Design a protein with these regions (language model features):
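Active-site metal-binding motif and surrounding structural segment of the metallo-beta-lactamase
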Residues: 32-45
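Short N-terminal binding/cap micro-motifs at the start of the first secondary-structure element
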Residues: 12-15, 153, 310
Length: 408
């Protein structure tokens, strides 16, 4: 069976206006190139927000509907361990799409997330601690999917679920987590690592990490598709292409398919106080933008050393070259104290951790410092605060209320 695996499209991601279309165009290219497959797997973070804007929804519906226009290539559903929604049968009649949710789509327990909504529309089959088995020409493929959970719970949840490969199947385990040594978020250390992943699977797929990787763990193929759009603006993204994986399950052959993502340059320049900082930076910019580009390239320059260059100068450079490239600057100051204070915020910004995940961890840290007992789910408290139900959250914290419903 031929399967395409796409991850982290982050539809709706737009740090600046010029980059607004990139997430849509890149995902559409990847998905279109995957239409020659028997199955398509989406490994989380299809959207950039847990409450996607209308434009992101419009593109998701437009792009995913392409699978419903394809003829089924003889792929049949053999088994699924969840109640299959009537609408989901629509995707089985054409090119089946299987998906899990990522951390950017995580919602409170009991709420419908964006991936579930797409399942309700008949565009995909959503897995969360579920397995589904397909068959084509006598060959069976079993897909076990665990959607994203907070990192501190990942190992316990995976152990409790205890997915076990099926006999006479090509077995795939689908995750969206930090896995040591592939650490993504600076907020929480992973509880999963290469050595404690379930054994016996033919293929393990992990979303969440934005740089593509292919490894071998014993007899298991381990792949990280990476994101289809540049979001972190880190050196690793400049060094690795964007795209997705295709796998032939019969031959156990894996192929990385590159897409035409916007060119991204990352440069570190060390400048001393005696040098002309602006002149050196400008020379580097001109060097990078020399050439023919389909889209304006992104150029990120990290400035180190003790050179004196003002924010005003950097903003002027951004304006000067705005018709040639998209410029980002970051400065590593020599003041140790200030550098330490900025390091955490910079790592958050560059890692593209969702605002929800940042807020959840800050809330948990604060509650731990106040010695609150675990008599409530702090994720529910966070969502109440996010929905401006402050009184309900306070009543639960004080033990005056046990339910999440507003007391009247």
């Amino acid at each position: 069976m031929k399967i395409s695996i796409i991850s982290d499209a982050h539809l709706g991601f737009s740090p600046v206006e010029k980059l607004e279309e990139d997430s849509y165009e890149n995902f559409e290219e990847a998905f279109t190139k995957a239409l020659d497959s028997d199955l398509i797997i989406l490994a989380g973070d299809l959207f950039d927000s847990r409450a996607p804007k209308t434009k992101a929804w419009a593109y998701a519906l437009k792009i995913l509907s392409k699978a419903t226009l394809q003829e089924n290539r003889g792929v049949k559903l053999v088994e699924i361990d969840k109640q299959l929604k009537e609408a989901s049968k629509k995707t089985l009649e054409h090119l089946p799409v299987i998906a899990i949710h990522g951390n950017h789509e995580l919602r409170a327990k009991g709420e419908i997330n964006a991936i579930e909504a797409l399942e309700n529309a008949g565009l995909l089959i959503y897995l969360n601690m579920n397995k589904v088995v397909f068959e084509k020409n006598g060959e069976k493929v079993a897909i076990f999917g665990l959607s994203h959970v907070p990192e501190r719970f990942a190992k316990d949840v995976l152990d409790k679920w205890d997915p076990r490969p099926l006999e006479d199947c090509f077995n795939i385990l689908l995750l969206h987590q930090n896995i040591d040594p592939f650490v993504y978020s600076p907020l929480e250390q992973p509880t999963l690592n290469i050595s404690n992943l379930p054994r016996g699977f033919d293929l393990i797929v992990d979303g969440h990490i934005h740089v593509s990787t292919q490894e071998k763990i014993d007899n298991t193929i381990f792949i990280i598709p990476g994101s289809t759009v540049i979001t972190q603006f880190q050196a690793s993204e400049a060094q690795n292409p964007k795209g997705f994986f295709k796998i032939d399950t019969k031959l156990k052959k894996v192929e990385f398919v590159e897409i035409n993502a916007r060119k991204f340059f990352y440069e570190t320049i060390e400048i001393s106080r005696e040098q002309n900082a602006r002149e050196i930076i400008e020379r580097k910019i001109r060097e990078k933008i020399f050439g023919n580009f389909k889209k304006q390239p992104i150029v990120k320059i990290r400035i180190t050393g003790n050179a004196m260059i003002s924010e005003k100068d950097l903003r002027e450079l951004e304006r000067k070259y705005q018709d040639s490239c998209i410029l980002f600057f970051t400065k590593s100051l020599e003041s140790t104290e200030l550098t330490q204070k900025l390091e955490f915020l910079r790592s958050l910004k560059e890692s593209r951790v969702s605002l929800q995940e940042i807020g959840l961890n800050i809330l948990k840290k604060s509650l731990d410092e106040l010695n609150f007992k675990n008599s409530f789910d702090f994720v529910d408290i966070f969502n109440l605060l996010a929905d401006e139900e402050v009184d309900t959250a306070l009543n639960i914290l004080l033990g005056q209320q046990k339910t999440l419903r507003m007391v009247k």
